[in-house]
Amino acid sequence: TPPYSSAASDVYKRQGLAPKAVQLVKFARLLPSVVLSRIPYAEMSRLSGWNKADSLLAVDARLIDALPEMRAQRLVKAVSAQVPLIDSEKTSLIAFRPVDGGEEHVAIVIGDLDTDQAVLVRLHSQCLTGDLLGSLRCDCGDQLRGAIKAISEYGGGVLIYLAQEGRDIGLVNKLRAYNLQDLGSDTVEANHQIGFEVDERIYAPAAEILKQLGIQKVKLLTNNPNKIDQLAATGIDVIERVKHAFPPNPHNAEYLKTKAAKTGHLF
């Protein structure tokens, strides 16, 4: 993440190598900090053999930007099972993962689906602290349970549970951001201070799952316009945004205000 530091930083910026190197470590959920070194062309053949001998990874920089979409396209259905829920006894879970392994996402199919009509859909990013522990710092737990109840009452729909902890910066980095928030930063500033964008999520996996379920038209439970824009860009027709907001508490009130003021959330 800018600013880059080193005598050769202008070279890296012109070639676009620094952002791509940072993106690689973000994919690994590491702090986005890297050391760059230029390799003279004459040394490339020797280093190529060295990479193989020492099991070092070599990546074509041109493929890095396309990696999230490529992995989304490689998602396949791994398994499905009936899992009755408190708010919807007629529920099945369908797990998806890339054919070559990796992050697993889950489609929670609630009630009856009519894919000839617009399907009520919620895209929900994994939140260990909110979903499982009931954290008051966010509204994730309310949104998860509220979405399941709303879809059940509607008669059917899908909640796609995405492996995107902490707006896709990972649990460790999310907790680092919490520490910065306790020192006075808001959620946007904290992400920037540890080198991440305010929201690192890409919804191509969600779009691919919807398509594999035969869903092309959706009513989207969301307050986040970015979800609508990204789904629309993949060819999913979002015919309606369904408001999905819950009362704040003393611990998340400022967080929700920041989302409205700085990230365009619609409450």
What are these regions (language model features)?
Residues 1, 16-20, 78, 103, ...:
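Conserved active-site and cofactor/substrate-binding residues in soluble primary-metabolism enzymes
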Residues 1-8, 12:
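Single conserved hydrophobic/aromatic residue that forms the stacking wall/gate
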Residues 14-17, 22-87:
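Internal gly/pro-rich beta-alpha loop/helix module
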Residues 41, 98-100, 113-115, 128, ...:
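Short, glycine-/Ser/Thr-/acidic-enriched flexible segments
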Residues 54-130, 257-267:
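Long, charged alpha-helical interface segments
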Residues 109-113, 117, 122, 138-159, ...:
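Phosphate-binding glycine-rich loops and their immediate beta-loop-alpha structural context
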Residues 129-140:
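Glycine-rich, acidic
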Residues 150-267:
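Conserved structured catalytic cores and adjacent interaction surfaces
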